């Protein structure tokens, strides 16, 4: 995903991304670069317009959501456990808030 993000950033700047450009963006962000993955990305998108790639990706996302069908249910026990988890988290958060009422920043 980071390789695609670098490609998108360069494309949106108006340039045609090259291997050196993508690697430079990734290195500037402090990301370790695998040159073979950059080459693979560039070969996959070669000759394609960035806007067309975005439209193609959107179509796949929308199509995947409607074609997937319903997810299997875990039953009533899973729903009960999921419902009790937020209540426990809220109670724990309230306990943590009480500790900060002394305003002792560097105690």
From Swiss-Prot:
HAMAP family to which the protein is assigned, alphabetical: Ribosomal_L12_arch
Pfam families (UniProt xref): Ribosomal_60s (PF00428)
Entry's Gene Ontology BP terms: cytoplasmic translational elongation
GO molecular function terms attached to this record: structural constituent of ribosome
Cross-referenced InterPro entries: P1/P2_N_sf, Ribosomal_P1/P2, Ribosomal_P1/P2_euk, Ribosomal_P2
Any one of the GO CC terms: cytosolic large ribosomal subunit
Composition-biased stretches (Acidic residues): 92-101
Complexes and interactors: P1 and P2 exist as dimers at the large ribosomal subunit.
Domain of life assignment: Eukaryota
Gene source species: Trypanosoma brucei brucei
Stated name of the protein: Large ribosomal subunit protein P2
Family per similarity comment: Belongs to the eukaryotic ribosomal protein P1/P2 family.
Alphabetically ordered keywords of this record: Phosphoprotein, Ribonucleoprotein, Ribosomal protein
S-S bonds: none
Cited function: Plays an important role in the elongation step of protein synthesis.
Post-translational modifications: Phosphorylated.
Region (Disordered): 86-107
């Amino acid at each position: 995903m980071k390789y695609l993000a670098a490609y998108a950033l360069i494309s949106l700047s108006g340039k045609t991304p090259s291997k050196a450009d993508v690697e430079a963006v990734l290195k500037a962000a402090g990301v370790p670069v695998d040159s073979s993955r950059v080459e693979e990305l560039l070969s996959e998108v070669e000759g394609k317009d960035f806007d067309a790639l975005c439209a193609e990706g959107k179509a796949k996302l929308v199509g995947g959501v409607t074609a997937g069908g319903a997810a299997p249910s875990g039953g009533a026990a899973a729903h009960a456990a999921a419902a009790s988890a937020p209540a426990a988290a809220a109670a724990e958060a309230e306990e943590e808030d009480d500790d900060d009422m002394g305003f002792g920043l560097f105690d």
